[in-house]
């Protein structure tokens, strides 16, 4: 086991494109860290830099107290699980798991003991003589994890390992990965664009955007107190409502500081009716434009009077902070499309951000 520390890590490609712009964070010994963000944010590039598959332009990466900037991937004592499994199709499951150990010159008895141990942990025993084409997607992913386990690494690295699986299998494998990491107590860094995956797996969540870290914290802290409007709109489904703090809204929030320019409220913190909010709270008149019933809850999509509906764009308050409002209500009862309703939020459900969306002010 080992901690992983990144200090002012940068990556600039030929031509001047800066993919990673001075990233700092630490993953404690035995922690499960998830890097999450949209496509192109730099999360996979950063993971590959930790693995040694991408060079570092500047900064330091430390694993277990050792700076590894110039250390070859095979000598970093890490194991990586890829999105596409990276299994040898002509080899059995047993040989896929044993291959790397044989290349390192490990004794046959030790190889067998490690493969059998991993097969027992992952319930792969009956499949050891099969080849990858005879396995389901979930079974192939377990073999890929088994190949990582047999190395007894200090750090596990996961690069979107579940993205090729169907929704039901993703949930099952997500649970299995978390159980496995806790059982082995090995430090892990996991990359995903799926915020639900990130929230359920992480001890430490690192939200990335444009090659930079937007926020670091526990999943619940990041959800409850997003540092920027990007985090507010990216973490959470449906996303946080972001509204420009114009005069009509500011007049309801007597304590709002003058530097606040955007008001945020989670869909679940809005309640339909009554017509007035509690002292310090918020009341909005909206016209219902769409309803989504998803079983135990319903999403009501509306637009404020005098505003046009606009798509919410994560991290771009000028485009996303408009008149659109999403309300999350329990059950299936909902007002009809076209009806004008009032929704209210209590003071503790309100979040204030700077006008550029880069700074949390209150809430």
Curated annotation (Swiss-Prot):
InterPro entries per the UniProt record, alphabetical: AAA+_ATPase (IPR003593), ABC_transporter-like_ATP-bd (IPR003439), ABC_transporter-like_CS (IPR017871), ABC_transpr_MalK-like (IPR015855), ABC_transpr_MalK/UgpC-like (IPR047641), Mo/tungstate-bd_C_term_dom (IPR008995), NA-bd_OB-fold (IPR012340), P-loop_NTPase (IPR027417)
E.C. number(s) listed in UniProt: 7.6.2.10
Residues bound to ATP: 37-44
GO biological process: carbohydrate transport; glycerophosphodiester transmembrane transport
Alphabetized GO MF terms: ABC-type glycerol-3-phosphate transporter activity; ATP binding; ATP hydrolysis activity
Assigned keywords, A-Z: ATP-binding, Cell inner membrane, Cell membrane, Membrane, Nucleotide-binding, Sugar transport, Translocase, Transport
Protein name: sn-glycerol-3-phosphate import ATP-binding protein UgpC
UniProt main location, coarse: membrane
Reactions catalysed, as given in the entry: sn-glycerol 3-phosphate(out) + ATP + H2O = sn-glycerol 3-phosphate(in) + ADP + phosphate + H(+)
Disulfide bonds: none
Top-level EC class as recorded in UniProt: translocase
Gene Ontology CC: ATP-binding cassette (ABC) transporter complex, substrate-binding subunit-containing
Coiled-coil regions listed in the entry: none
Location of the protein in the cell: Cell inner membrane
